[in-house]
Amino acid sequence: MIRKEQLYEQILEQIDLTKETDDEELQELIRTVLDEAADEEYISLSDKIRIGRELFNSFRKLDVLQELLEDDSITEIMVNGIDHIFYEKEGRIFRSKKCFLSQERLLDVIQQIVGESNRYVNEASPIVDARLKDGSRVNVVLNPVALNGPILTIRKFPSEAITMEQLIRIGSVTDEAANFLKKLVAAKYNIFVSGGTGAGKTTFLNALSNYIPKGERLITIEDNAELQIQGVQNLVRLEARGPNAEGEGAVTIRDLIKSALRMRPDRIVVGEVRGEETVDMISSAMLNGHSGSMSTGHANNPTDMLHRLETMMLMGIDLPLQAIQRQVASALDIIIHLGRLRDKTRKVLQIVEVEGYEDGRIQTKVLYEFKEEGMKNGKIQGCLMKKNEITNKEKLLAAGYHTV
């Protein structure tokens, strides 16, 4: 039986390392090696095509991961060492039959991905976040932290940003709620999108950002560039950078927020806040005349999101908790909470208004809430129901919206 690793080694031996081999030359070399192998042992045409494609991917692309990346129905790829490759499809986890030829080949693919993002990873610095050219999010963990071999996780993003109309069509949000949010964005309400891992926060923030008036100057700030803002001409995209091998040259989210404030922004969108940069997002951006700012955060519910914001602000500034709570209550207008339900669908579960600070705590009001109504054909039935009218209408009225 023809072994792919033997063919790989034969091709590697015949490549002229003194000059660059283009794609056409490589494909011709692969065909020649396959034809020679077919003279010794029968290879069907379909197998020839498959093996040829796999060999080309090994040299030019991301090896055995390439086919998974090209499958639009796959949303996540998980590599646990060379021969344990899993992927998520339609909410379910499957194991791939593919495997890397060696740990060295897997490490080559990892270094290729990380290098294209201007990051680095090695045993001295074994954890890194990066991204693919299409914006897909990548996380890498190496030995000695990863005990069973290199760990590579890729969360894929659609080639084109999902719109709010598409989210309405698949039932993630209702038309009524989306129209309400459209008015809030246009009226420059400060909005946080919360939810657990994989709830669709970045996707929803992308869709929400399409409601930003196209004539505004928008600055996006991210750890890894994932946002796909559409239609805004005056757009500035900033991406944080980790330290170099000498531990120098890091540019943090906090640094970028401070810099963005000097760029005359109409709005600032931060992909996700995780730590002390929350101080600058809340105190400097949202409370400093840049209404309409948006961000996301990990939380189990809107109340949890508020507590996490308080905790993250305490990490970055020495103020009493009461003062922190007052700042959060003054800065934040709306929390949109997303969830991934047991049928694997993603939905808006709550839209909550932050009313202010009173009686020693931040006061909130549920405006919309998802109400489950049972199961049908394995899918959860329900609707995002309006519960209350918004209290703080000043920004809506100033924007010309007299009915909501």
Give the location of each predicted region:
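Conserved lysine of the Walker
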Residues: 201
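P-loop NTP-binding catalytic core
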Residues: 71, 84-187
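Walker A (P-loop) phosphate-binding loop of P-loop NTPases
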Residues: 198
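Switch/coupling sub-region of P-loop NTPases
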Residues: 188-191, 207-330, 337-339
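NTP-binding/hydrolysis catalytic cores, primarily Walker-type P-loop NTPases
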Residues: 343-404
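The Walker A (P-loop) glycine that initiates the GxxxxGKT/S ATP-binding motif of P-loop NTPases
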Residues: 195
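Residue-level signature of catalytic and energy-coupling elements of molecular machines
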Residues: 11, 77, 140, 181, ...
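N-terminal accessory targeting/assembly segments
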Residues: 1-123
